[in-house]
Amino acid sequence: VVAAGYESKEILGTVGIDVPMSRVLIEALVTEAEPHMFDQMLGTAEADFYGHQTKHGSFVFGGSSGYEAVNKDNGTPICSSITAPCICRGIMKYFPDLADAKIVRTWAGWADQMKDGVPVLGNVSEVPGLVLATGFCGHGFGIAPAIGHELADLIVDGKTSIDINALRYDRFKAKI
């Protein structure tokens, strides 16, 4: 099983598999504790931000500005002066009560993303026994329990309980 995020590309390259993926810089911020507002994980259709309020009361939000691609700094993920304000503007559209919330810290990191934005999950026919799970672009934590269950079924039983054909690696092969 190769489930190594962006590093899957390098690992798979050692057996001649070229996975069309890139890494995407994403940033996050955390606020001081605030009064309880909600328990759900939130995200917007406009992709302004995503996040949740912790039991402690602080908010953890993430997002992007669209300018992260120019801020790669030789491979070191660093926070820009652009992204946190963009995330905050998105938050303010929905939660104006957070206008005075203080940001405690910000950080940046890499997410793995497939060329078509859809993760790869399943067997790789070119290498018998190889199972791939990569390209989740930050969604891996949210869907990890379901992915783990389906991977276990695939490895043990040779099949999954749901149809994962749309996630197969060979969708990137030329169709002649």
Where would I find each of the regions flagged by the language model?
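Central helical "cap/lid" subdomain
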Residues: V2-F38
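A short alpha-helix-loop-beta-strand transition element characteristic
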Residues: V19-M21, D100, G158-I164
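Active-site lid/adjacent beta-loop-alpha segment flanking the redox-cofactor pocket in flavoenzymes
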Residues: A33-G129
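C-terminal lid/capping helical subdomain adjacent to the catalytic/cofactor pocket in oxidative enzymes
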Residues: S125-I176
